[in-house]
Amino acid sequence: MTNHYIDLKNSDCILIMGGNTAENHPIAFKWILRAKDKGAKVIHVDPRFTRTSARCDYHVPLRSGTDIAFLGGMIKYIIDNNLIQEEYVKYYTNASQIVSSGFDFQDGLFTGYDAEKHKYNKDTWTTEKDAAGIPVRDYTLQHPRCVYQMLKKHYDRYTLDKVSSITGVSKELLLRVYKDYGATGAKDKAGTECYALGWTHHTVGSQNIRTMAIIQLLLGNMGIAGGGINALRGEPNVQGSTDHCILYNLLPGYLKMPYASMDTLAKYMDKYTTKSND
């Protein structure tokens, strides 16, 4: 959860997928309605029409399990219509980094797939580096193998016709959602996504969230009031116990616990700090 419930009131567009917030998370929904009272658009994408749907601006029924296709279409729409928050994408994501020439994707599979083991060898999943070991970047985002162009190529297949046929959502309704949420890429706007177990309990639950993370990064909706990706948990204190380090294996900020052998801060930092040549 990147933001807190009260911060939902600062959003200009709230996309609810994989959850029934009004019934299952009424306190969180209070702040969603506060945003709606201030003019925010609230969209509910769900196979069922629920109390949440009734309180939103509009409901989008889709086939269960087709969330990734739905979001993939939004990624293509954002890129094709140049709705990205360009400064954020260039300087605060890896979009400008150049992907190694050994990496590619064909027929839905990435390079390195082992058909017998059903696993990937990720040795080619790297970026090019200069003599100092620093990732090579193209801040124009025009290099054919920069992350942004590779992303554009990958999602080019998610046409409106294809997404509509997979999800069962009409092209007109898809465009309505994509236009409303894509508008949050403007510098004075913020959009947030709220999800619950309707996303996480799928076998592709992690991929659902990662796909939405791509959208939020493209629109610059991370790290701002009214933005982020926010979990509506299925148990009373799942989020609180992790955020406030009540669990035995975490320190504040989701930092890992040290081993007994790490008797100095330097040893702890050496073990857990990401190495960088920048």
Regions found by a protein language model. Give the residues of each.
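Glycine-rich phosphate/diphosphate-binding loops that line cofactor/substrate pockets in enzymes
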Residues: 4-12, 153-154, 176-192
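Conserved short loop/turn motifs at secondary-structure junctions
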Residues: 162-169, 195-203, 232-236
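Short, well-ordered beta-strand core segments
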Residues: 14, 42, 59-61
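A glycine-rich phosphate-binding loop feature that marks nucleotide/adenosyl-phosphate handling sites
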Residues: 91-97, 180-181, 196-198, 228-239
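Acidic/polar loop patches that form or flank catalytic/metal-binding clefts of enzymes
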Residues: 84-89, 173-175, 190-193, 221-231
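Generic recognition of stable, solvent-exposed alpha-helical segments in well-folded globular domains
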Residues: 9, 23, 27-30, 37, ...
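Long, well-ordered, tryptophan-enriched scaffold segments
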Residues: 50-184
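Extended redox/cofactor-interaction regions of prokaryotic respiratory oxidoreductases
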Residues: 1-27, 31-32, 38-40, 69, ...
